[in-house]
Every structure is written in C-alpha cells, then in structure tokens.
C-alpha cells in the first residue's frame, strides 16, 4: 500500500475516452502474444471499445478469435482504434454501435454477431456504468438508479438470454465482468457495487442451470484498473490515488486483466471451470 499519487489528477466527461487519459492505459497492444487458444472462435464483448473490454478484444483476436463488440456513439474514436487492433491481429472485427439499456439492442448485438461472423462461442458481459456520488441516498434519482441497473444487470440478462441458444450449439461460454466492489463496496458507488454483487449471484445460478448444456459461466472481478471509467466517474484526487490502497500498492492495467478472460474462455484450459469468480485485484480478497 502507498499514499503516493499513482496518476496525475484528472477528470473527463462520461463515458470517457482513452486518448484523453494521462498516461494512456496499457491494453496489451505491444505485449500480448497469443498461442492459438481461441482459434476459429467468435466472441462478443459488450463495451469492448476501451479499458478492459479493449484488452480482452486484443487478447481474444491474438488467440485466434473474430471479435464483435458494442460501444456507445460517444465512444466511436475508441471503437475505431479497437477495430483496427483486432484487424491487425489478422482477425475480423465487428463494431456495433448500440445502447444496451434497450432490450432490442441486446438482441441485435447477438443477432448481428451470428449473422455476420457465423457463430458465437464466447459472450463477455463487460459493459457497465458507474458514477461516484456526493449526494445523500435520499437524493438518489430514479434516472440514476435506472441507468445503473439497466446497463449493469438488465443488459447482462438480456444479452445472455439472446446468446444461450447459439452457445448451446458449440457449446460455448459466458464470462461476466464483476468487481472488487462486490466484496468491498464503496458508499459513493452504492448502486454500482450492488449490481456487481448481483452479477456474482447470477454467475453461480447460470452456471448451475446451463451446465447440463455444456455452457460454462464464470466471472472476473477486477480491482482498481486504469480505464476511462476512472477519470470519467471519480473525483480528480481519487483518480490520482487509484490503487494505492491495494496490497500491491498500485492500480492494474487492462492488459493485466485480459489473461483471466482468455483462461476462462479457453475450451481446453478451463474446460472444468464453471460457476467461479476469478479475482484480478492486486491482492484484495474476493471471498
């Protein structure tokens, strides 16, 4: 643990952009080397334009998968960069501009992935919304609650529901992105933390229900990771000290999360792994 600033104090307007971060995150652009663990597969990564989603898209592509990913209109510069990185790995990118708080958009994400890339092997439910708050709980707005729940929970359920019939054909797998907030919730992120705890429960339940179909369902719980979500949703001083309270004394990079997703997606490496949450937290416990 350390009290030393980790990053320059900074803020952005949500949802945040990679190019406006100082320093820019490491998504594995220069470091990730694939070994063919997902050769010939197709993955759909929600919120895959930046942060952990981009790192996962890069890693999956370098492991041999074509990658579809969703993004919001404001995130197009990041989405274009991610698509180029997937294509640079010799795989086919499919960038889908969709707001997953709409059920029809979740259905479209899955439908277009299968229609344009031919199949679906891996679903990564990564898209999320958080916003640190200063106000009292009694001032919590319905709009804030609705956006957090729809982005983090409804979209996950809708997208997974649409994906299951296609995943049964392979069979494939689902990987949910949860958070250390499910275990050590921050008061300022009450709604976000609650959705992440719910995702843990959903992961276990879906693993039990879909296991007989051969579909594995797991989750990754990142700790404080240097992504656009941080300067776009936290106070500048909080951003500066991101990760300083972890046992490793620093924030993680998206590139340090991606191998966990690759492991869980691999039909050989994780063939008997289902219903678990894998922590990538810098030493913070996830039990």
Question: Which residues are covered by each model-predicted region?
Answer:
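C-terminal helical subdomain
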Residues: 1-27, 219, 241-269, 273, ...
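The beta1-alpha1 cofactor-binding region of Rossmann-like NAD(H)/NADP(H)-dependent oxidoreductases
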Residues: 76, 97-110, 142, 255-256
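Substrate-binding pocket helix/loop in short-chain dehydrogenase/reductase
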Residues: 134-137, 141-146, 242
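Active-site loop-to-helix junction immediately N-terminal to the catalytic Tyr of the SDR YXXXK motif
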Residues: 135-136, 185-193, 205
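Active-site helix of classical SDR
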Residues: 160, 195
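Alpha-helical segment proximal to the catalytic Tyr-Lys
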Residues: 165, 208-212
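Residue(s) in the substrate-gating loop at a strand-loop-helix junction
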Residues: 179
């Amino acid at each position: 643990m350390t009290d030393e600033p980790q990053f320059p104090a900074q803020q952005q307007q949500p949802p945040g952009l990679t190019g406006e971060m100082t320093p820019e995150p490491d998504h594995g652009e220069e470091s990730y080397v694939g070994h063919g663990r997902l050769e010939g597969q197709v993955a759909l990564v929600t919120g895959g334009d930046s942060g952990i989603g981009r790192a996962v898209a890069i890693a999956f592509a370098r492991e041999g998968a074509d990658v579809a990913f969703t993004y919001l209109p404001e995130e197009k510069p990041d989405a274009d960069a991610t698509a180029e990185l997937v294509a640079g790995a010799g795989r086919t990118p499919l960038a889908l501009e969709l707001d997953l708080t709409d059920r029809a958009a979740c259905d479209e994400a899955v439908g277009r992935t299968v229609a344009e890339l031919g199949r679906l092997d891996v679903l990564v439910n990564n898209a999320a919304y958080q916003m640190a708050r200063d106000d009292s709980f009694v001032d919590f707005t319905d709009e804030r609650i609705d956006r957090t729940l729809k982005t983090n929970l409804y979209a996950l359920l809708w997208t997974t529901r649409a994906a299951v019939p296609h995943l049964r054909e392979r069979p494939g797998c689902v990987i949910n992105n949860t958070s250390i907030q499910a275990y050590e919730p921050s008061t300022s992120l009450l709604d976000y933390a609650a959705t992440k705890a719910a995702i843990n429960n959903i992961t276990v339940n879906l693993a039990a229900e879909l296991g007989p179909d051969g579909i594995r369902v797991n989750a990754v719980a990142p700790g404080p990771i240097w992504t656009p979500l941080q300067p776009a949703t936290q106070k500048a001083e909080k951003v500066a000290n991101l990760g300083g309270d972890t046992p490793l004394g620093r924030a993680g990079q998206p590139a340090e999360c991606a191998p966990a997703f690759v492991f869980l997606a691999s039909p050989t490496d994780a063939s008997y792994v289902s219903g678990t949450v894998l922590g990538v937290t810098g030493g913070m416990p996830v039990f």
